[in-house]
Amino acid sequence: MKFLDQAKIYIRSGNGGAGAVSFRREKFLEFGGPDGGDGGRGGDVWVEAVDGLNTLIDYRYQQHFKAKTGMHGMGRNMTGGKGDDVVLRVPVGTQIFEEDNETLICDITEVGQRYRLAKGGNGGFGNLHFTTSTNRAPRRANPGQEGIERTIWLRLKLIADAGLVGLPNAGKSTFLASVTAAKPKIADYPFTTLHPNLGVARIDGREFVIADIPGLIEGASEGVGLGDRFLGHVERTRVLLHLVSAQEEDVAKAYQVIRGELEAYEHGLADKPEIVALSQVDTLDPETRKAKVKALKKACGCEPLLLSAVSHEGLNDTLRQLARIIDLSRAEEAGTAQAEE
């Protein structure tokens, strides 16, 4: 399935049904009074988060959505039926924005969460409503109210517990494939990964979701390369795993480039807990390994983990560290929610 994380769509709620002009028609009742019913309300437009989706690709092929018009009122004071609603089914993590693509309407973060984007028009009054002391047989009824028309943006920010960041070819996709059942495209050239991939990692009876973000380069926050578009997918993560390839001549600079982009992007990414790891260490001799670990430690201010997806060196240790931070974050979140209650 192709990945799409942004879509512009046009929605319109249904018009209300027209009220009816009707009079009682009964045997032995020569002048029956008015009995025109009201029109039904127009259908609403809703957005709802469903399980099993991680792309907005369906909205590439259909951009216009219109709810049904309410049924017209009928005689015998019968109100018309409500028009059918339209429900936009989206992945968990979808945000809805106004036409300017900046004003947030709602943030859909849980399966089953619904939000009404456009309310259907009210039905028109039937002629029964227009009876007065001087007009006992009104021949007038209201048309239904017009529906609401809006242009909106859907923007998906994947919900993952851990995010993988690093320069192109840092080994992010290889790591994801090694510790989860995900099957990202892997090749020996930059920008092999063109969209985020998700995988579920398991360690010591615990499981969490990891997001692999396409490689960043210097200037990504200004739109260079793939730009910073995909950084939005790690905004919701609890921890970042920053991979620095052992193939880099200057591992300190490689680390600093990504840190600079995280800080330039803002939105709290630079403040997230970070685990730094030197990847592809199976390609180094002991002396070179020692030198690169020392340089990276100096740059990041902590002892980097050593990783190799080929020899599986350090994989379990890395997962345990990620799980520990994620557990702490979840516990803190649960404590905050409990305190608010």
Curated annotation (Swiss-Prot):
Q: Start and end of every OBG-type G domain?
A: 160-327
Residue numbers binding GTP: 166-173, 191-195, 212-215, 279-282, 308-310
**From the UniProt record, which GO molecular function terms apply?**
GTP binding; GTPase activity; magnesium ion binding
* Residues annotated as domain Obg: 1-159
Q: What class of enzyme is it?
A: hydrolase
Q: Name one GO biological process term.
A: ribosome biogenesis
* GO CC terms in record: cytoplasm
Q: Specify the superkingdom.
A: Bacteria
Family of this protein: Belongs to the TRAFAC class OBG-HflX-like GTPase superfamily. OBG GTPase family.
What's its job? An essential GTPase which binds GTP, GDP and possibly (p)ppGpp with moderate affinity, with high nucleotide exchange rates and a fairly low GTP hydrolysis rate. Plays a role in control of the cell cycle, stress response, ribosome biogenesis and in those bacteria that undergo differentiation, in morphogenesis control.
What is this protein identified as? Answer: GTPase Obg
Question: What species is this protein from?
Answer: Brucella canis (strain ATCC 23365 / NCTC 10854 / RM-666)
